Swiss-Prot record:
Transfers the 4'-phosphopantetheine moiety from coenzyme A to a Ser of acyl-carrier-protein. It comes from Frankia casuarinae (strain DSM 45818 / CECT 9043 / HFP020203 / CcI3). It catalyses: apo-[ACP] + CoA = holo-[ACP] + adenosine 3',5'-bisphosphate + H(+). This is Holo-[acyl-carrier-protein] synthase. The gene is acpS. Transmembrane segments: none annotated. GO terms for cellular component: cytoplasm.
Length: 118
């Protein structure tokens, strides 16, 4: 396996929460129903950071759909990525076969780091 790309994104939790409160429809556009069920702003901010980090790994090609990247929790609560549709197609063009995700939120910021490998 070889690393194809690394993406990192940082989101200010309070600012993100204010955006969600000001524009309620944005959550529908950005998150899957499962993700929206996590309601706590720091969790949503971390998931948005993950989606941004994935886009950075892919070179942010036009046409990526936010819902095509979903953060899911595996055994023991470990986060991972579910990639479908436009994001899966962009990943296939780059030969990406596996994804690694790390999320954290502390001190008012949420951070996601994504590594993609062939």
């Amino acid at each position: 396996m070889a690393v194809v790309g690394v993406g990192v994104d940082v989101v200010d939790v309070d600012r993100f929460a204010a955006t969600l409160a000001r524009t309620p429809g944005i959550a529908m556009r950005l998150f899957t129903a499962t993700e929206r069920g996590l309601a706590r702003p720091e969790r949503l901010a971390a998931r948005f950071a993950a989606k941004e980090a994935v886009a950075k790994v892919l070179g942010a090609p036009p046409g990526l759909e936010w819902h095509d990247t979903e953060v899911v929790l595996g055994t023991g609560g470990r986060p991972s990525l579910r990639i479908i549709g436009t994001v899966a197609a962009a990943a296939a063009r780059l030969g990406i076969a596996s994804w690694h995700l790390s999320l954290t939120h502390d001190g008012g910021v949420a951070v996601a780091m994504v590594v993609a490998e062939t």
